[in-house]
C-alpha cells in the first residue's frame, strides 16, 4: 500500500506564518490563519448571524503556545466562519472557539429538538463489533493520530515522524491493524481525558499515570493488573489519577471487558417486600453477580466483586481483597447523630466500563480514576431518590419542616450532608474536592485551553454541579460541546451483548426483548380492558371538606376493583342524569356543620333532593363520616340514604358510620368489606369466595408481640418538629403571658382568658375569626397510672424507637408514626389516652388478658350491641380500662403501636393581631364531668385542664387554622348580627377588637354591629361584660343584648328567645333589606335552635312556605352571608348534666 502523503501536514517551517491580531474581548493575542479544505466547517457549528459570502476570511486563533496541530496553513473554507463566540455572562468575557472544527462525530440533536440532556447519547456510545475496522477506514484515522502525537513536541521530529507514518501504513497493510507505542499510548490516554467534555477536573489531565496491560491474556492477569491499579491510586488516601489499558479490540470477538461500571461499587438487593437494601443503582448488576455464583451478604454497603472478561471468553468473578478498598465512615462536625446513620463511602472513584478510541483503535477495557468531588457522593449517591435517598431522614433529624417544600428543607439538608462528606474525607486524610473549588479549577483550565488549542469541549449540563447552581462560575459560562479524538466513549453493558461459550453459566435472568415486552404489554392491556368491560360498573361518589372522604373513596375503589369496574368521582363532577344508567352506586361523604353537606356536594344535593322519581332501579350503599358529639351525626349520609330509597333504589347494606372521635378507620373497613361481599353476592360475581382483597381489609384482630420491638435511640426530642411531621403542618411555640378566670367567685365553673405571646411576631399571622390549634399534654396522673401497668417499661427517660418486623420476617423497619422518644413522652405528648378504645382495640386487648373471664368480657364488649352501651355509659379512659381489667399484660410496644394519636384542640381566636401584636387570646371553658349518671369517675377535658395548670412563660405548641367562612365582611360598612352564648363569644371579641383598631388608626366607622350574648347569671358568668359596655360607648358595638337562663324568679331565656322577641326587625333589615351578615358561634344545639328561629322569623315576615324558606337560607349560605362556627355539645350517655361544667366537645372540632 502506498503511503498516503495527502494526509500529511505541511512542514513545520510554515507553522508560524501567522498575523497577530488583538481581540479586546479575549484580551489575548490572536492569530489569523487559513484552513485546509480537507477539514471544512460543518454548517451545524456556524455561529448564527454570521454572514457567509464565500470569500476568503481571516480567522482568529490563539498565538500563545499554539499546538502545532492547530497551526497549519490551509485553504480558505468556502462554507462559513471557522470560529464561534462563547460568552461568559458573569464577567462579559468572550472566547473564540476554533477547535470545534476538529470534531469527529455529529451529535444526535435534531433540527427541532435538543438532546443535550440525554444521559448516554448515541454519538457518545460505542457498541460491539462483529468484524475488524476496514483498513481504508483505519489508515486515515491512524495517520491523523500520528500527526497529533508528533505535533505535541516543541521541536519538530520530521525524520521520526515520516518513519512512523510509513511503519503504521505498512503494518495496517500487512495485518489490518497497528499497535501504539508505549509513548503514544500515554499521550492518547491523557489527550482523551483532556477531550472529555463531561469531566470538571481536567486541569490535571497531564498528570495521569498510565499502566500498560496490553500484554495481558487471562482474566486472572486482568485482576492482578486491576489490584495494582487500585493499590497505586488509593495510596493510603492520597488519591492519584491512573488508567490501566488492556488489549485493543481486534475482530470484536476477542474483547477484553470489565463488566463493572466502576471498579468499586456497592451491591443493591431487591428484598421480598419490594424494598431495596444497598445501592439501588446496582440492582441488575448485583443480581448478575449472584447468578454467576457470588454469595450476597445483604448489607447496605457490600463491595461488589469484579466480573472480568478476557479475550472474548466467558467472564470470571473475583472478590476484591478488603485491604484494597479504602472506605470513609461518614460523620458531621456538628451533628453527632449523623454517625448513627451508618453511612460510608469508598475513596476511589474508578470508572471501568468506558472505551478508549484513539487513531481508529478501540480499547474496550481501560479502567481509570481521578478523585471525588464532594457532591458526587453527598448529592447524587446519598440524596438521589433512586439511590440511597437519605435526604428526608436527615431533614427530619435536623428538625426541618419536611412536610412543606417552601421551608427549603431539602436545600438545608443536602448542604449539611455535603458538609459531612467533605469533613469525613478530610478527617481521614482522603483526597476530595469541594464543588466550588472544582468549578474554579475548570474555569482556569478552560481559559488555558482556549489559549493553547483555541477551544475546550464542554458539556454544560454535566459540568454545573448538582447544587449551588448560579453561585458557581461555570453556571454563567457558555460552552460548546463536541467530540474530538482520542475520546472515552460509553459502551453497551457487556452482559447484554456477550456471546456465551458455556451455556450452563449463562445468568438465569434474561432481559425480555423490547419488542416482545411491548407485545406482551399490549396484549395484557387488551385483556384487562376486556375483563374490566365485562365487569359490573360501580360509581363511587365522595363529598369532603378535609380530604378524608376522598381518601376513603379511593381506598374503596381499590377494593371494588378486585371484582368490579369502579370509577371514583367527586359529587360536583357527577351528572345527576347518570343515575338512570347506574347499576351500583357507592357514596362516601362527611357531614359538615349542623348536618350540612360539604361544599363540593351542595350542587348534587340540591338536584337530588328535588328529584321526584327514577325509572332505573340500582343498588347502593352509603358510608358517612362525622363526629358523634353532634346531634345530627352523619346526617348528610343518612339523608342521601333516605332519598335514594325513596327514589326506588335498593339498599345493599345499612348506612355505615365513621366516628371521628373513635375508630373511624376500623368502622370504614368493616363496612367496606361487608358492602363488597354483599355486592359480589347480589351481582353473582364468579369465584367471589376466592377473591384476594387489599391487605388493609384483611388485617388480623390479634396483636402479636414478636412483630414489634423497642430499640434504644440517642436522638433528642424536638417537640415542635415532631408534631409538625406527625400532623403535616407548621407547629410553632407560643408562651403563656397571663391567665385570668373570667367568671366570678360565685360561679362553680371556670372560663379562662388565655393570653399567649410569640417571641417572633413575624412568624405569627392570623385574621379575626380564625382558629388556633393547640397541642396539649395529657394529665400526669393518667400517664403515671398507665406507666405503672406496663409490663416491660423501658424506663421514664430512655429514648426508644419502635421497630416492626417485615411480613416476610426477614428484617426490621422503623415505625414512623411516632418520633424517637421515651414512653413517658409518648403518653404525654403524642398518644390519646382519654378516648375510649375502639372495638378493634378491645379485641386486641382481649388477647392480652390472662384471666379467662376478663378475656370473654372484652370480646363481648367488642361487639356492636355491647360496645355502644359500654362506651357511652362509661366513656372510659385507657387507664380506666386497665383498672377494669387488671389481668391485662400490656407491653410498651402495644401502647406505641395501637393507641391513637392525640389530636390538636381548636379554639376560636379572641383577639385581633392589629390590636394586640404578637399575641393570641383564647377564651377557654375548663371541662369537668362525671360519667354513669354522676356516679362515675371525674373526667377532665384534655386541653382545658392542661391550660388551667400552666404558669407564665410555659410553652404552648400551636398552629393557625384558617376559617375563610367566618371572617368580617370585606365591606366594613355592611351591618352584622353576632350571636354567641358562653364561650361562643370568643371570635366576636376578635371582631370588635379589629373594629376598634380600625376606628382608632384609620377613623373607619364600621356598619352596625349588634351582639347577642347568652349566659346563666349576670353576677356569675357574664364574661367580657365590662368590655362589651366599653365597645358600646365607643361606638364599635351598636347594641348588646343578653339572655340569662338562671335568673331567680324569671323564666329561662336563651339567645333564640331574644332573637324572636327583640331583634326580629333587625334580622329582617340585615338579611333581607341590606346585604348584611349574621354570625353564630357556639354549641350545635344552640346553632340549630337559632337557625330554626330565624327561619320562622323570615317565613312570617316574608310570607314564605317551608320549601321557600329553606331555599332562602340556602342562598344566604351560598352568598356567604350566614356564618356558623359551631362545636359539639352532646354529653356522653349517663353524664349528669347539672354537674358538668362543659361538655367534652367544648374543644373545637
Swiss-Prot record:
Would the keyword Oxidoreductase turn up in this protein's UniProt record? yes
Q: What is its EC number?
A: 1.14.13.39
Cellular compartments annotated: Cytoplasm, Cytosol
- Known catalysed reaction(s)? 2 L-arginine + 3 NADPH + 4 O2 + H(+) = 2 L-citrulline + 2 nitric oxide + 3 NADP(+) + 4 H2O
Q: Which residues bind FAD?
A: 771, 905, 907-908, 923, 925, 929, 942-944
Enzyme class (EC, first level): oxidoreductase
Residues bound to (6R)-L-erythro-5,6,7,8-tetrahydrobiopterin are 117, 380, 461-462, 475
Binding of L-arginine occurs at: 262, 371-372, 376
Which residue ranges are recorded for the region named Disordered? 22-83
Q: Which GO terms describe its biological process?
A: defense response to bacterium; nitric oxide biosynthetic process; peptidyl-cysteine S-nitrosylation; positive regulation of interleukin-6 production; positive regulation of interleukin-8 production; prostaglandin secretion; regulation of cytokine production involved in inflammatory response; superoxide metabolic process
GO cellular component entries: cytosol
Which residues participate in Zn(2+) binding? 109, 114
- Where is it chiefly localized? cytoplasm
Q: Mark out the compositionally biased spans (Polar residues).
A: 50-61
Query: Where expressed (tissue)?
Result: Expressed in the lung and colon. Not detected in the heart, aorta, liver, kidney, and spleen.
User: Pfam families of this UniProt entry?
Assistant: FAD_binding_1, Flavodoxin_1, NAD_binding_1, NO_synthase
Alphabetized UniProt keyword annotations: Calcium, Calmodulin-binding, Cytoplasm, FAD, Flavoprotein, FMN, Heme, Iron, Metal-binding, NADP, Oxidoreductase, Phosphoprotein, Ubl conjugation, Zinc
| Signals that turn on the gene | By lipopolysaccharide (LPS); in kidney, spleen, and colon. Expression is reduced in the presence of LPS in lung.
Domain (FAD-binding FR-type): residue spans on this chain = 729-969
**Single GO MF annotation:** calmodulin binding
Activity regulation, free text: Regulated by calcium/calmodulin.
PTM description: Polyubiquitinated; mediated by SPSB1, SPSB2 and SPSB4, leading to proteasomal degradation.
Q: What subunit structure does UniProt give?
A: Homodimer. Interacts with NHERF1. Interacts with GAPDH; induced by oxidatively-modified low-densitity lipoprotein (LDL(ox)). Interacts with S100A8 and S100A9 to form the iNOS-S100A8/9 transnitrosylase complex. Interacts with SPSB1, SPSB2 and SPSB4. Interacts with ELOC and CUL5 in the presence of SPSB1 or SPSB2 or SPSB4. Forms a complex with ASL, ASS1 and HSP90AA1; the complex regulates cell-autonomous L-arginine synthesis and citrulline recycling while channeling extracellular L-arginine to nitric oxide synthesis pathway.
What function is annotated for this protein? Produces nitric oxide (NO) which is a messenger molecule with diverse functions throughout the body. In macrophages, NO mediates tumoricidal and bactericidal actions. Also has nitrosylase activity and mediates cysteine S-nitrosylation of cytoplasmic target proteins such PTGS2/COX2. As component of the iNOS-S100A8/9 transnitrosylase complex involved in the selective inflammatory stimulus-dependent S-nitrosylation of GAPDH implicated in regulation of the GAIT complex activity and probably multiple targets including ANXA5, EZR, MSN and VIM.
Q: What is this protein called?
A: Nitric oxide synthase, inducible
- Source organism per entry reads Cavia porcellus
Amino acid at each position: 500500500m502506498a503511503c498516503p502523503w495527502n494526509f500529511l501536514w505541511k512542514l513545520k517551517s510554515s507553522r508560524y506564518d501567522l498575523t497577530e491580531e488583538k481581540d479586546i474581548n479575549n484580551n489575548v493575542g490572536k492569530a489569523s490563519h487559513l484552513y485546509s479544505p480537507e477539514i471544512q466547517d460543518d454548517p451545524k457549528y456556524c455561529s448564527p448571524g454570521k454572514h457567509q459570502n464565500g470569500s476568503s476570511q481571516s480567522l482568529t486563533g490563539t498565538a500563545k503556545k499554539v499546538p502545532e496541530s492547530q497551526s497549519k496553513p490551509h485553504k480558505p473554507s468556502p462554507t462559513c466562519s471557522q470560529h464561534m463566540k462563547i460568552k461568559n455572562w458573569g464577567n462579559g468575557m468572550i472566547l473564540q472557539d476554533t477547535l470545534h472544527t476538529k470534531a469527529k462525530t455529529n451529535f444526535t440533536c435534531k433540527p427541532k429538538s435538543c438532546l443535550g440532556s440525554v444521559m448516554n447519547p448515541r454519538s457518545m456510545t460505542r457498541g460491539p463489533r462483529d468484524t475488524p475496522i476496514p483498513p481504508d477506514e483505519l489508515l486515515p484515522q491512524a495517520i491523523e493520530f500520528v500527526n497529533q502525537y508528533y505535533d505535541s513536541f516543541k521541536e519538530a521530529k520530521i525524520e521520526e515522524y515520516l518513519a512512523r507514518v510509513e511503519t503504521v501504513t505498512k503494518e495496517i497493510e500487512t495485518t489490518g491493524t497497528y499497535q501504539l507505542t508505549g509513548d503514544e499510548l500515554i499521550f492518547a490516554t491523557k489527550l482523551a481525558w483532556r477531550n472529555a467534555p463531561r469531566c470538571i477536573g481536567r486541569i490535571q489531565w497531564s498528570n495521569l499515570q498510565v499502566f500498560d496491560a496490553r500484554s495481558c491474556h487471562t482474566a486472572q492477569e486482568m485482576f492482578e493488573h486491576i489490584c495494582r491499579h487500585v493499590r497505586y491510586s488509593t495510596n493510603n488516601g492520597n488519591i492519584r489519577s491512573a488508567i490501566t489499558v488492556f488489549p485493543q479490540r481486534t475482530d470484536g470477538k476477542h474483547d477484553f471487558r470489565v463488566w463493572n461500571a466502576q471498579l468499586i461499587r456497592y451491591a443493591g438487593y431487591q428484598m421480598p417486600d419490594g424494598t431495596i437494601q444497598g445501592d439501588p443503582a446496582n440492582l441488575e448488576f448485583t443480581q448478575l453477580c449472584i447468578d454467576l455464583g457470588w454469595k450476597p451478604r445483604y448489607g447496605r454497603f457490600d463491595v461488589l466483586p469484579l466480573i472480568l472478561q478476557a479475550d472474548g471468553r466467558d467472564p470470571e468473578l473475583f472478590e476484591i481483597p478488603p485491604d484494597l478498598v479504602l472506605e470513609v465512615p461518614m460523620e458531621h462536625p456538628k451533628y453527632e447523630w449523623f454517625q448513627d446513620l451508618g453511612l460510608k463511602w469508598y475513596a476511589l472513584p474508578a470508572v471501568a466500563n468506558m472505551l478508549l478510541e484513539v487513531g481508529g483503535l478501540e480499547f474496550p477495557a481501560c479502567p481509570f480514576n481521578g478523585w471525588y468531588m464532594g457532591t458526587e457522593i453527598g448529592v447524587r449517591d446519598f440524596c438521589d431518590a433512586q439511590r440511597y435517598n437519605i435526604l428526608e431522614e436527615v431533614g427530619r433529624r435536623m428538625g426541618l419542616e419536611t412536610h412543606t417544600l417552601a421551608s427549603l428543607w431539602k436545600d438545608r439538608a443536602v448542604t449539611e450532608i455535603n458538609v459531612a462528606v467533605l469533613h469525613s474525607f478530610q478527617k481521614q486524610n482522603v483526597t476530595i474536592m469541594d464543588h466550588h473549588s472544582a468549578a474554579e479549577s475548570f474555569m482556569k483550565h478552560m481559559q488555558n485551553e482556549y489559549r493553547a488549542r483555541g477551544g475546550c469541549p464542554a458539556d454544560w449540563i454535566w459540568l454545573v454541579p448538582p447544587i449551588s447552581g448560579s453561585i458557581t462560575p461555570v453556571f454563567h459560562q457558555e460552552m460548546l460541546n463536541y467530540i474530538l479524538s482520542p475520546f472515552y466513549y460509553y459502551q453497551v453493558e457487556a452482559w447484554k451483548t456477550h456471546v456465551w461459550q458455556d451455556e450452563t453459566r449463562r445468568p438465569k435472568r434474561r432481559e425480555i426483548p423490547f419488542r416482545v415486552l411491548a407485545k406482551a404489554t399490549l396484549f395484557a392491556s387488551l385483556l384487562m380492558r376486556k375483563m374490566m368491560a365485562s365487569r359490573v360498573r360501580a360509581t363511587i361518589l365522595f363529598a369532603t371538606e378535609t380530604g378524608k372522604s376522598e381518601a376513603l373513596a379511593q381506598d374503596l375503589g381499590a377494593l371494588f376493583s378486585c371484582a368490579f369496574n369502579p370509577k371514583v368521582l367527586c359529587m360536583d363532577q357527577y351528572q345527576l342524569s347518570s343515575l338512570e344508567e347506574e347499576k351500583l352506586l357507592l357514596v362516601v361523604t362527611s357531614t359538615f356543620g349542623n348536618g350540612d353537606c360539604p361544599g363540593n356536594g351542595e350542587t348534587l344535593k340540591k338536584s337530588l333532593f328535588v328529584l321526584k322519581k327514577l325509572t332505573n332501579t340500582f343498588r347502593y350503599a352509603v358510608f358517612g363520616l362525622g363526629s358523634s358529639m353532634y346531634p345530627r351525626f352523619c346526617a348528610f349520609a343518612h339523608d342521601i340514604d333516605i332519598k335514594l330509597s325513596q327514589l326506588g333504589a335498593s339498599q345493599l347494606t345499612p348506612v355505615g358510620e365513621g366516628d371521628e372521635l373513635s375508630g373511624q378507620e376500623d368502622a370504614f373497613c368493616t363496612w367496606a368489606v361487608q358492602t363488597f361481599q354483599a355486592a359480589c353476592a347480589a351481582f353473582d360475581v364468579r369465584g367471589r369466595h376466592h377473591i384476594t382483597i387489599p391487605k388493609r381489609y384483611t388485617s388480623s384482630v390479634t396483636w402479636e408481640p414478636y412483630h414489634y420491638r423497642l430499640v434504644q435511640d440517642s436522638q433528642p426530642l424536638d417537640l415542635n418538629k415532631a408534631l409538625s411531621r406527625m400532623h403535616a403542618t407548621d407547629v410553632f411555640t407560643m408562651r403563656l403571658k397571663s391567665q385570668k378566670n373570667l367568671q366570678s367567685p360565685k360561679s362553680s365553673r371556670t372560663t379562662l382568658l388565655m393570653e399567649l405571646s410569640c417571641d417572633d411576631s413575624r412568624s405569627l399571622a392570623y385574621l379575626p375569626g380564625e382558629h388556633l390549634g393547640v397541642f396539649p399534654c395529657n394529665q400526669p396522673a393518667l400517664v403515671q397510672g398507665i406507666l405503672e401497668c406496663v409490663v416491660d417499661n423501658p424506663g421514664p427517660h430512655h429514648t426508644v424507637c419502635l421497630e416492626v418486623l417485615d411480613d416476610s420476617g426477614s428484617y426490621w423497619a422503623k415505625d414512623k408514626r411516632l418520633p424517637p422518644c421515651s414512653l413517658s413522652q409518648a403518653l404525654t405528648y403524642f398518644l390519646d389516652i382519654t378516648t375510649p378504645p375502639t372495638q378493634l382495640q378491645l379485641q386486641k386487648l382481649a388477647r392480652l388478658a390472662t384471666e379467662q373471664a376478663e378475656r370473654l368480657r372484652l370480646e363481648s364488649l367488642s361487639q356492636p350491641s355491647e360496645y355502644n352501651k359500654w362506651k357511652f355509659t362509661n366513656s372510659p379512659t385507657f387507664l380506666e380500662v386497665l383498672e377494669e381489667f387488671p389481668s391485662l399484660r400490656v407491653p410498651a410496644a402495644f401502647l406505641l403501636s395501637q393507641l391513637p394519636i392525640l389530636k390538636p384542640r381548636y379554639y376560636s381566636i379572641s383577639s385581633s393581631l392589629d390590636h394586640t401584636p404578637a399575641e393570641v387570646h383564647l377564651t377557654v371553658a375548663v371541662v369537668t364531668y362525671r360519667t354513669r349518671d354522676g356516679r362515675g369517675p371525674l373526667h377532665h377535658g384534655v386541653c382545658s385542664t392542661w391550660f388551667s395548670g400552666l404558669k407564665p412563660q410555659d410553652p404552648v405548641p400551636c398552629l393557625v387554622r384558617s376559617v375563610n367562612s367566618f371572617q368580617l365582611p370585606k365591606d366594613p360598612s355592611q351591618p352584622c348580627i353576632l350571636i354567641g352564648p358562653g364561650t361562643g363569644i370568643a371570635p366576636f371579641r376578635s371582631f370588635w377588637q379589629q373594629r376598634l383598631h380600625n376606628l382608632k388608626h384609620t377613623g373607619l366607622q364600621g356598619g352596625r354591629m349588634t351582639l347577642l350574648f347568652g349566659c346563666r347569671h349576670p353576677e356569675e358568668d357574664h364574661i367580657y361584660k365590662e368590655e362589651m359596655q366599653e365597645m358600646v360607648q365607643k361606638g364599635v358595638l351598636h347594641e348588646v343584648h343578653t339572655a340569662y337562663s338562671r335568673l331567680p324568679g324569671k323564666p329561662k331565656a336563651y339567645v333564640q328567645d331574644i332573637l324572636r322577641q327583640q331583634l326580629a326587625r333587625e334580622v329582617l333589615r340585615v338579611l333581607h333589606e341590606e346585604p348584611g351578615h349574621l354570625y353564630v358561634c357556639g354549641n350545635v344545639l344552640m346553632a340549630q335552635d337559632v337557625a330554626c328561629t330565624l327561619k320562622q322569623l323570615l317565613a312570617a315576615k316574608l310570607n314564605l312556605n317551608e320549601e321557600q324558606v329553606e331555599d332562602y337560607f340556602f342562598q344566604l349560605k351560598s352568598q356567604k352571608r350566614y356564618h356558623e362556627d359551631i362545636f359539639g355539645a352532646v354529653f356522653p350517655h349517663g353524664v349528669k348534666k347539672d354537674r358538668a361544667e362543659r361538655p367534652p366537645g367544648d374543644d373545637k372540632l
